[in-house]
Amino acid sequence: KTVSGTLVKAADMYLQVADVVIFRSDILTITSGDAPSEDPKKPAAGRPAGNESTDQEATRSSELEIDPGAPGVFYLPMSGMVGLEMRPEEIEMIVAEADKRGDGQTIVLDIESGGGMVIEYILMAQTIVEYKKRHKFVAWVGEAISAAAATALACDRIVFKSNARLGAITMHSSGNPVSDETEERWITLLKGVLRTSGYSEHWARPMVRNDSWISYVRDPDTGDVEYFSSPQGIAGEVVLSNWTENCVLSADQGVDSGLAYGRADNKEQLAKVLDLPSWNDLGTGQKMHDTWHQTCVKCEEDIRKTTARLGMLGEYSEMVQLRKRIEIYKRWLRWWKKAPNQMLLLGIPSINQLEEMIEELQRELREGRG
């Protein structure tokens, strides 16, 4: 498809030609119309003859060849516990949708999470870092604590909601603090993620350890920000973490310190922050989110009910008990395939263990015990 007209606006993520908005990622070629046509007196197709001003406007126009399907924003809510409701699989799915539109898409992760499992964050960070090579990731942050904050820092841009909190990327093992050596490895990993996003490495240590310092000074003229890992005692220095607490940023702090790209409380405001003409959600991220959350709820409910049934099998004969146990364990195997994260957190025997348990019960049935 070719679009002709006067170039009205050239924004960061799109061009506006006449009244048509075209995303930069959609543009294949741009041709200047400064040179006269073969017959400058011949009116343009569909235009009345003698309309010189219209012809002159067409002469000054640019012609852009674009794909017929205009891409936009791919929105994915990410809420709940990191490693359970919030996981990398949905990121993979939304990227697959974006890939169909070509490179250069904008993927918005709407993050509302108090944290969770570190290993799952590592998988999510690796997923985001890999796909950032061809798409832009935006973290739209409300509550982003611990592993959720680290996920946001893996994105190219961070936009805060007014009630946002981001930080406190602490590590624990079964509720207990981890060793200093483990924390240092975690800090090194976080620094690497920050580099891929273009953020200062100064953020890593004070968000992980409460015995660290981060402050900054913003140049009032240029807006440039300089970060410090120790007190400077200079005019304008703003302290965010002071040796006694993990760094947790509010919306005001995130924006003023330069970590956040802007602030938005709804999708229309977010579109403006991202320099988009309007909000245009082209993916099915909301459905992905809702489907997975519903699966987690159904899984937990079913495990609770079937576990209760196991405790009430005493009223049946031994042969019936064996069959009902096999039925329940096979049901659990199906849930392992549908919701492995939930099954792990619920402490259900692994697939291998269940298969061995089923095999043993089937052997007892064959031998006719009971």
Residues covered by each model-derived region:
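A short, well-ordered alpha-helical element
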Residues: 84-105
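Soluble non-cytosolic domains of exported or imported proteins
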Residues: 21-24, 81-89, 115-122, 143-146, ...
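Charged, glycine-interspersed solvent-exposed loop segments at helix/strand-loop junctions
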Residues: 172-289
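Conserved RNA-binding domains used in RNP assembly and mRNA/RNA metabolism
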Residues: 1-56
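Second-shell loop/turn segments in exported
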Residues: 75-85, 108-115, 138-142, 171-181, ...
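Intrinsically disordered, low-complexity segments enriched in small/flexible residues
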Residues: 33-63, 200-205, 209-229, 271-370
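STAS-typified acidic loop motif
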Residues: 64-90
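Glycine-rich beta-to-alpha active-site loop
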Residues: 113-182, 186-189, 210-221
